[in-house]
């Protein structure tokens, strides 16, 4: 059916899109600095900086969200490399993981730093094997 074809094309183009973004340098505008709480869900505390990438729209119609690793103080913005993508299996949006260009993180290290929020979702962490 036409609808099923559209879903398959969407899934393939999404996979290509994710693979193309891994390793890219992006600028994250921080709207939830390290040490703050989620504006709506007050029990979610941000142990790392979190924000969005201006001009890149996510499937939820908002700008692409990103976790920032490797920065140990609250910041307003950060430029770094997309080292992983958190693909939520039960949500429409992915979260990108951005870190300083010269830092490497294992899947386990990434998971440890994002679980404060991702524990509420089913997800997989996508990354290039060369990041390990």
Segments predicted by a language model, with ranges:
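Short, Lys/Arg-enriched N-terminal segments with co-localized hydrophobic residues
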Residues: 1-20
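Hydrophobic N-terminal alpha-helices or hydrophobic patches in metabolic proteins across all domains
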Residues: 20-132
């Amino acid at each position: 059916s036409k609808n099923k074809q559209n879903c398959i094309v969407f899934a393939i183009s999404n996979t290509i899109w994710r693979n193309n973004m891994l390793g890219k340098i992006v600028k994250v505008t921080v709207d939830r600095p390290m040490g703050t709480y989620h504006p709506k869900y007050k029990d979610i505390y941000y142990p790392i900086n979190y924000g969005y990438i201006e001009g890149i729209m996510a499937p939820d119609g908002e700008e692409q969200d990103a976790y920032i690793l490797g920065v140990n103080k609250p910041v307003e913005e950060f430029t770094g490399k997309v080292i992983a993508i958190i693909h939520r299996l039960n949500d429409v949006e992915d979260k990108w993981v951005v870190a300083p260009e010269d830092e490497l993180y294992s899947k386990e290290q990434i998971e440890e730093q994002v679980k404060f929020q991702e524990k509420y979702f089913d997800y997989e962490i996508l990354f290039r094997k060369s990041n390990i």
